[in-house]
């Protein structure tokens, strides 16, 4: 039984989602957004660090997963996004959590089945997968998608490693 914290980083809005995994079942624990205020980037980064640190204290996750930086519309946006990711990753590292990173395409593929899914499709599938009464807001849904992607990736690796070491009729499978 593992608790996974997924994060969708942003310099203005950072989404988070927490799921608990029991066998093949994924249970929703919580989600939301850290909304930063002000124009001072160092202050916004501190707000992200403090927010993620508080979520870690509240939910006590075993694992941390975050979306990788994608190619932004301009260099300044990409740099700010990278710094927001860094603040979240440092919060996880301070809490001694293992950090996993996934591309947007990997996340959408794990949740929807196609790497080119739209935000609305991700929201809908997260609602269905986690049996939520309503679709979560976009940033929180993306963060829950990161957590679900991490869970599925781990399940696949466990299955593959199990098969690779299982000997049947004198052959390895």
From Swiss-Prot:
This is Crossover junction endodeoxyribonuclease RuvC. GO terms for biological process: DNA recombination; DNA repair. It catalyses: Endonucleolytic cleavage at a junction such as a reciprocal single-stranded crossover between two homologous DNA duplexes (Holliday junction). PANTHER family: CROSSOVER JUNCTION ENDODEOXYRIBONUCLEASE RUVC. It comes from Shewanella sp. (strain MR-4). Homodimer which binds Holliday junction (HJ) DNA. The HJ becomes 2-fold symmetrical on binding to RuvC with unstacked arms; it has a different conformation from HJ DNA in complex with RuvA. In the full resolvosome a probable DNA-RuvA(4)-RuvB(12)-RuvC(2) complex forms which resolves the HJ. One of its GO terms (cellular component) is Holliday junction resolvase complex. The gene is ruvC. Its cofactor is Mg(2+). SUPFAM superfamilies: Ribonuclease H-like (SSF53098). Keywords: Cytoplasm, DNA damage, DNA recombination, DNA repair, DNA-binding, Endonuclease, Hydrolase, Magnesium, Metal-binding, Nuclease. Its main location: cytoplasm. It is an enzyme of class 3 (hydrolase).
